[in-house]
Amino acid sequence: AMGADKLGLSDEELREIVNSWRKASPHIKQLWYDVDAAALEAVRECRAVTLHHGVVFSYRKGILFLRLPSGRRLAYVRPKIEIEPEFDREGLTYEGSEQTSGKWTRLRTYGGKLVENIVQAIARDCLAAAMTRLEAEGYQIVMHIHDEVVIECPADACDLGNVCRIMGRSIDWAPGLILTADGYITD
């Protein structure tokens, strides 16, 4: 998975790497289980379940909502709790677009995948906050890619240090989150 098949490692070697990483990262592994349990509980009991740092799962009118610390919500349509035959345990499915075909279908998710959604969504919200601040300071953003912004400005008006300071400012909804930025100027 995720390109590991191109490394020329055997399945056993890959399993060993994964197991070593999980053993070295017990808090992340526990977060996967906590998030999985919270999502299942929200669907099963049709109620809000609060996790750490303002992450809340809630179920309403056939939609599982995941509220992020920023207040933005992700939505999982028509969630169901089903038995995962390969693991012989309850798992969560929802309706959405299949990633490769774009076909609307029932998709399976789990704690690790939900944590990935949370992390990527929070990173997006951090970038959006930085972009809003940059634009308020008069910088013209011409595009952004993942966690980067491209700013177009006259050479005598570009202050890379100021751009990095603006991007690294704390965010109201993420107290204690340390943000830094780096960059370069090109013609």
Predicted regions and their residues:
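Conserved catalytic core of nucleotide polymerization and phosphodiester-bond processing enzymes
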Residues: 1-187
